[in-house]
Design a protein with these regions (language model features):
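Predominantly a Rossmann-like dinucleotide-binding segment in NAD(P)-dependent oxidoreductases
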Residues: 1-77, 132, 218
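C-terminal glycine/acidic-rich active-site capping loop/insertion
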Residues: 33, 47-92, 114, 119-195
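C-terminal capping/lid region of NAD(P)-dependent oxidoreductase domains
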Residues: 212-223
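A general structural signal for well-ordered alpha-helical segments in protein cores
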Residues: 27-28, 177-181, 208
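Glycine/proline-rich active-site loop of Rossmann-fold NAD(P)-dependent oxidoreductases
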Residues: 37-38, 78-80, 94, 107-111
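Glycine-rich phosphate/pyrophosphate-binding beta-alpha loops
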Residues: 25, 99-108
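Beta-strand scaffold of nucleotide-dependent catalytic cores
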Residues: 97-100, 124-125
Length: 223
């Protein structure tokens, strides 16, 4: 709604990008983490759906859906994106595309990732975090339930409970800090840490900046 409002809508506080910088940065990082590929070039198109939003003149809880009276709002022009489409080129020559939206009704925090190979497609939906959809060319498609006994060791290391015991969003932070604390206990950082570092944070900032450059110039931009 045009009454949805928080500090991220104000560029002087949050910067010149919103949907990409706020939630797209996480998706772009996940893509590189899972695939092992690096994004080398981007082409972006931004869209601001609500060009004017109503800023509450009194406190209102984020995500609450509560409405104030008309006189309790001030009209504010919006200069950051509600929605973005980004084409990606990877360092191995493959392509990808990303859609990020903060104006999709009913989608509070969904992350969907789909990777298509030469023979199979794998899809993950964060709203069903214990399932992976596997698309096949010459047999029935499959839904794989999370089960440490069926996973590679690298994946099993990120699972705490046995199959049939759900794990979800809150467990991701737990798994992250297990790796961080293990490095602290060892007294040194691994040569190739699985957890994000300052270098990863810098890279995501750089990618977001290049995406901004692309939407402004309407051209492909190298990372």
């Amino acid at each position: 709604y045009n009454t949805d409002y928080n500090w991220r809508l104000e560029p002087d506080k949050s910067g010149d990008s919103r949907a990409i910088a706020d939630i797209g940065s996480h998706l772009l990082d996940v893509i590189e983490y899972i695939t092992g590929l690096k994004t080398v070039e981007v082409m972006a198109d931004f869209n601001t759906v609500h060009k004017v939003r109503k800023k509450p003149l009194k406190p209102v809880e984020t995500y609450s859906g509560k409405m104030l009276q008309p006189e309790d709002y001030a009209d504010v022009p919006i200069n950051t994106e509600d929605h973005a489409n980004v084409l990606l080129r990877f360092d191995n020559g493959n392509r990808g595309c990303v859609t990020v939206s903060q104006v999709s009704a009913g989608r509070k925090n969904q992350l969907k990732l789909e990777i298509s190979g030469s023979n199979k497609t794998f899809a993950f939906n964060s709203e069903s975090p214990n399932e992976m959809w596997i698309g096949n060319r010459d047999q029935a498609n499959q839904v794989l339930m999370r089960d440490p006994s069926l996973a590679y060791p690298e994946a099993t290391a990120l699972m705490t409970f046995p199959g049939g015991h759900n794990e979800g969003f809150s467990d991701t932070s737990k798994q992250l800090f297990k790796e961080v604390y293990a490095a602290v206990e060892a007294g040194k950082q691994p040569e190739n840490p699985k957890y994000p570092t300052f270098a990863d944070g810098y890279r995501e900032l750089l990618i977001c900046e290049r995406i901004l450059d692309s939407t402004r110039s309407q051209k492909w931009v190298k990372i």
